[in-house]
């Protein structure tokens, strides 16, 4: 089957719309977890057999004298091909459990056949209006969903009877499903989304003058194709498999459009018909989740799994372990409280307003087995001063010059404890400060990192702390003089790790240093995971911290604060952006290396790092 590598991101975002849907979801949606199952063509369809009473609202159904369900539309009750198909699949599931329902299943399947016309289409013989149209469908309308669900019924009916009528009906149903709308069928293309997608197919649940691309109906039709591809006696099985694969390819291309940043929409009418906002049918978010799970179990396609996990996490109410505060300084102080419950000899005080000097201090904090507290340039906030009082250190190492942490701040701290000794490590710029700090670290290895962005430094910070490796800051195209001096003075260094791609540290720099190894990705998040994979043997993956890694220049503080704490347990820090997108490199690392019992701890508040981001990367399979 097809595996793709699309990235997960929200095409549309309206937080009020999302919040309303999430608040309604527990009351309006079925428990989608009941329908989560690895899919088998001749097995219990989506666990319907175990959940018939939950699947159907029997108050809206009326059963005829033969026990066939009818649904009310307008003033009358009618046979709906989808309702008949789903009810028969539930009865089939009961049969698989050992109940005496085989004949009832076949009776419903036969009733379904009475709705099939000579072309192979299953007809809705009642008038109905789709909310996006300004006209009614006349009796005899068709849909891709009905075709797909009928194929799932007919595949099972033929499997347990060998009766050719089901085989013939299924082949006709398949032919109708893959017939273009322009020729009277239900197959469309995705050209209304993008000209680049005009060759991608989709099976429309509701035929309209402008395609609307209803998601659940499309996925149900794909299950039908998969089922028919597994009917050995069908001369159409290869055709079914071909269109299933093409449909999966389309699905992976368009899932991003249904993600509105915290919930899913029902269709894409908000794009194709230029509607003001997406249409949300709250219960169908759960349907999307269990259909994606079923299709992933068939294809092993990572894109499907990524969206399954993400959409499931959107409505996961499970709280996650979290260390946070009202701002970066309280978060920093709370992390320090986790670092040690008692007093401590030394602490490091670095700028909470500028990342350069603070990040260079990571291996020094590890050497002194102490936390890094964050301060402001000309004042000391209450969270930091109270934590200093609690820790009652003998010594404070101030990182950076007076532009980073002023003498006034030191004097204010001194007022709380006159016995505190201050040591300042600060050069005329970030490169000299990096040199001065690194000169205090004994190591045979060093990290060389771009000095004008914190992202790559955050990626190696935990490894730097665990292994005691100094962090040297450099320019993109030349090595600053203080760092040149370090390289010349420290001949014991036998390996320099260059962090980041050629766009941040040039090949020219690499050529000037012996014994280098470059670790870099296409962005900061891939670099982060490549670093973690490179040093995976140094890490204990039973606990993982997750923090924001950008894109703002101020998004470094929580991850930096966490480094000394993470180093104690040799835990990695996974970086994610503040945007809703979860980079593929992050999910790949999580799914490949973490377990479903891994303790993932969020660093920072829910506003910047919501629960769903953590829950979405916890592996299930």
Go through the PLM ranges and name each one:
Residues 2-12:
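Sec-dependent signal peptide cleavage junction
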Residues 120-177:
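Hydrophobic alpha-helical segments and helix pairs
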Residues 318-621:
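Extracellular glycan-binding segments that recognize GlcNAc-based cell-wall polysaccharides
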């Amino acid at each position: 089957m097809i595996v793709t590598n699309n990235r997960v991101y929200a095409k549309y975002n309206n937080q009020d719309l999302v919040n309303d849907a999430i608040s309604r979801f527990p009351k309006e949606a079925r428990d989608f977890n009941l329908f989560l199952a690895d899919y088998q063509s001749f097995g219990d369809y989506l666990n319907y057999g175990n959940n018939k009473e939950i699947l159907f609202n029997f108050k809206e159904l009326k059963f005829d004298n033969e026990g066939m369900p009818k649904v009310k539309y307008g003033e009358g009750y009618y046979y709906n091909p989808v309702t008949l198909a789903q009810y028969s699949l539930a009865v089939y599931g009961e049969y698989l459990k050992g109940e005496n329902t085989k004949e009832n299943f076949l009776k419903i399947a036969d009733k379904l056949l009475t709705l099939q016309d000579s072309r192979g289409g299953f007809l809705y013989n009642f008038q109905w209006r789709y909310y996006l149209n300004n006209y009614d469908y006349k009796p005899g309308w068709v849909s891709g969903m009905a075709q797909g669900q009928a194929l799932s019924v007919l595949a099972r009916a033929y499997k347990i009877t060998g009766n050719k009528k089901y085989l013939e009906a299924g082949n006709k149903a398949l032919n109708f499903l893959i017939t273009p709308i322009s020729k009277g069928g239900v197959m469309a293309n995705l050209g209304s989304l993008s000209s680049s997608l005009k060759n991608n197919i989709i099976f429309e649940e509701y035929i309209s003058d402008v395609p609307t691309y209803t998601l659940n109906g499309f996925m149900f039709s794909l299950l039908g194709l998969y089922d028919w591809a597994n009917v050995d006696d069908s001369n159409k099985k290869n055709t079914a498999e071909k269109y299933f694969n093409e449909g999966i390819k389309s699905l992976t291309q368009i899932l991003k459009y249904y993600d509105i940043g915290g919930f899913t929409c029902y269709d894409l009418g908000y794009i194709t018909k230029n509607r003001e906002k997406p249409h949300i049918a709250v219960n169908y978010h759960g349907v999307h989740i269990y259909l994606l799970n079923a299709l992933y179990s068939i294809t092993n396609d990572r894109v499907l799994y990524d969206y399954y996990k993400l959409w499931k996490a959107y409505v996961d109410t499970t709280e996650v372990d979290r260390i946070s505060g009202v701002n970066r300084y309280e978060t920093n102080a709370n992390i320090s409280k986790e670092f040690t419950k008692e007093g401590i000899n030394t602490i490091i005080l670095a700028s909470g307003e500028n990342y350069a000097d603070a990040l260079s201090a990571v291996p020094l904090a590890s050497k002194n087995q102490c936390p890094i507290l964050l301060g402001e340039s000309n004042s000391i906030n209450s969270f930091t001063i109270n934590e200093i009082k609690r820790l009652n250190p003998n010594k404070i190492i101030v990182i950076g010059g007076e532009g980073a942490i002023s003498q006034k701040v030191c004097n204010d701290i001194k007022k709380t404890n006159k016995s505190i000794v201050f040591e300042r490590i600060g050069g005329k710029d970030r490169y000299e400060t990096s040199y001065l700090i690194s000169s205090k670290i004994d190591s045979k290895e060093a990290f060389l990192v771009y000095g004008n962005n914190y992202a790559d430094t955050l990626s190696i910070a935990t490894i730097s702390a665990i292994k005691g490796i100094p962090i040297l800051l450099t320019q993109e195209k030349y090595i600053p003089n203080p760092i040149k001096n370090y390289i010349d003075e420290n001949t014991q260094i036998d390996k320099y790790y260059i962090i980041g791609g050629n766009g941040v540290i040039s090949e020219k720099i690499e050529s000037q240093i012996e014994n280098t190894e470059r670790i870099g990705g296409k962005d900061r998040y891939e670099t982060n995971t490549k670093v973690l994979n490179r040093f995976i043997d140094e890490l204990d993956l039973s606990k993982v911290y997750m923090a924001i890694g950008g894109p703002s220049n101020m998004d470094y503080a929580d991850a930096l604060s966490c480094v000394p704490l993470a180093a104690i347990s040799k835990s990695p820090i996974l970086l994610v952006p503040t945007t809703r997108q979860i980079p593929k490199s992050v999910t790949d690392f999580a799914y490949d290396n973490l377990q479903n019992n891994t303790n993932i701890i969020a660093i920072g508040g829910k506003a910047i790092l919501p629960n769903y981001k953590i829950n979405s990367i916890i592996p299930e399979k």
